[in-house]
Amino acid sequence: MEGRTTAGRATPAGFWLFSCCLASVLWSANALIPAGKSAGSSFLAATSSQSSEEAPREFPGHLSNSQIASETGSALKIEEIASSGSAPEVSGAAGASASKTSEKPIRPYHTGPSSRSSAYSASSGIPLCHTCSSFDAANGGCRLCVHGEVASDFLMPMMPIRNIDTHREETLSRLEANHRTHLNEKKNFYVLRGKGPFGSLGNLPGTPGLDAAIAFGLSSPDLPSASFAQIKNKDSSDSGDVAAVGEETDSAVADGSKTLDLDLKLAETSVPILQMKDSQYVGVIGIGTPPQFVQPIFDTGSTNLWVVGSKCTDDTCTKVTRFDPSASKTFRAANPPVHLDITFGTGRIEGSTGIDDFTVGPFLVKGQSFGLVESEGGHNMHGNIFKTINFEGIVGLAFPEMSSTGTVPIYDNIISQGTLKENEFAFYMAKGSQVSALFFGGVDPRFYEAPIHMFPVTREHYWETSLDAIYIGDKKFCCEEGTKNYVILDSGTSFNTMPSGELGKLLDMIPSKECNLDDPEFTSDFPTITYVIGGVKFPLTPEQYLVRSKKNECKPAYMQIDVPSQFGHAYILGSVAFMRHYYTVFRRSDGTRPSLVGIARAVHNDDNSAYLSNVLNEYPGAHIRKEDLMMERSMSAPSMREL
């Protein structure tokens, strides 16, 4: 699937749409938004799901100063966070070490007290994560826990991707096509676990029905449809495909004819999607000696590391910053050489694998393997992954089991240095064209409302955790007792998704209607969508999940995508439709506890925006071109603005 081979996580190849679509939210065009390997698999199977009778907890706000003082004796002064969502002022600072390969230091930042979590834990009865040795709730273990608010080691500013205006229009049109085709033509779209690029969600080239997706306008013929499973070593005696590249090996997903074991059937009503990758945010990494800075996407839905090389002289390659191996004193080609040859219906992408030193903030990762794109498009520019999205690379942050090359992922190499306070990273997605942030080694309490609830990863491949229920308003929408359901937190896609059996019901309950932004009460006609995970409610208000189409229609930023497998029904939570509103944490197993994902309400305010803008200005290799920024138009309704 997947074409996109490089430059950006799953390229928009196939559902690029999907992802794209998500991107749409980035909105493009029109989103409405208010002003070593895990060793904890043994814990995963033991995680129990919430009883249908158990009442979910309301999403908690901040504790008062008096509560904190009385329960923890903390002398730190913390101002209560008002309902407007302003961040607390906290004294104290922690400086991150400077990059060893740049004269510019990584900007230090202020950190908050862990007493907030301790106090909340004491008052709620939910244990702090470091006290949980078991997540087998049925046998007295933890079902969820509270993050201890360990301050991060450093933050990386993240910027909106280029050409957003064009990109948002295309992704929004794909969202509309998804709704129209699903509802009017009764077509269901699906992806398979481990069949996309880098082991991400998608389908392999040659899967029956892929052409139909293109016919529906859902898989753009201008984007590649190849899979990284097509890596070939042309310089060795074995020129065959690398076996099981980037795939999960479960019997239920190993054979496409046997995967649809839920309500979906492989028939004329089912259409495979090549891939769903699409991000609206890029960060910064340095490659080589001296470091050459590029701006890749950071993707929790894949694992591999790819950049665009200087040998790629196609027009679309020259639009982005390319890495020049000849200018690096430390670059060396893989030995034996590995040639990457990814073919798709109307073109191809070629490249090689190399080894070089990478700079990620203050960390210097020596001898990192990565893919280098050297040619794409062939004799035909159809399928060119750079034609629509100007990714300069992709940094996969998922689990090592997803690696398509068998090499150690860059994040695992950072962990192996032993310098992170916690083996975790966290995303803060800002609104519009403002600067976002990726934190390594901990969290920054200014960017979220405590506490951060942490939930065990149910299977250490994707960042996924069990889903208890979804409510539309006060009506339970999902999930039936006895069924398996889970959410995947995916920073590489923008929209949220629902299975085929659910999206139609959602659109019946939340039909598209003409946007009336002159009426401040307009969104009062729409219900809140609430996810219940581990007994905790995470609501999305209409201002957060609605997008506005070119026809001035307000519609939910949800796509229909089935992910059939024996693991249950998958609900993807994307970077713009969910992660923009919630600060998300991704913690790897420490060998005694499972990997965890954490969620807390994000705090968006002028102070945070100004701070991150300053970080961006001082960060090595970070920059935003004026032509890359999306123009924002002021809206009449004070509670909404178009992104």
From Swiss-Prot:
Phenotype on disruption: Conditional knockout in tachyzoites results in a severe defect in the lytic cycle due to a failure to invade and egress host cells. Specifically, exit from the host cells upon both natural and induced egress is delayed, and parasites are trapped in spherical detached host cells, eventually rupturing the host cell membrane. Secretion of rhoptry content and processing of several rhoptry proteins, including ROP1 and ROP13, are impaired. Microneme secretion is normal; however, processing of several microneme proteins, including M2AP, MIC3 and MIC6, is impaired.
Q: Specify the Peptidase A1 domain's residue ranges.
A: 281-600
Write down a Pfam family by its short name.
Answer: Asp
Sequence segments annotated as region (Disordered):
87-116
Active site annotation, chain numbering:
D299, D490
At the top level, the lineage of the source is: Eukaryota
Task: Kindly give the Gene3D superfamilies that the UniProt entry links to this protein.
Answer: Acid Proteases
Q: What is its EC number?
A: 3.4.23.-
Q: What is its main location?
A: membrane
- Write out the GO biological process terms: protein autoprocessing; protein processing
Gene Ontology CC: endomembrane system; membrane
Name of the protein: Aspartic protease 3
User: What lineage is on file?
Assistant: Eukaryota, Sar, Alveolata, Apicomplexa, Conoidasida
Report which gene this protein is encoded by. ASP3
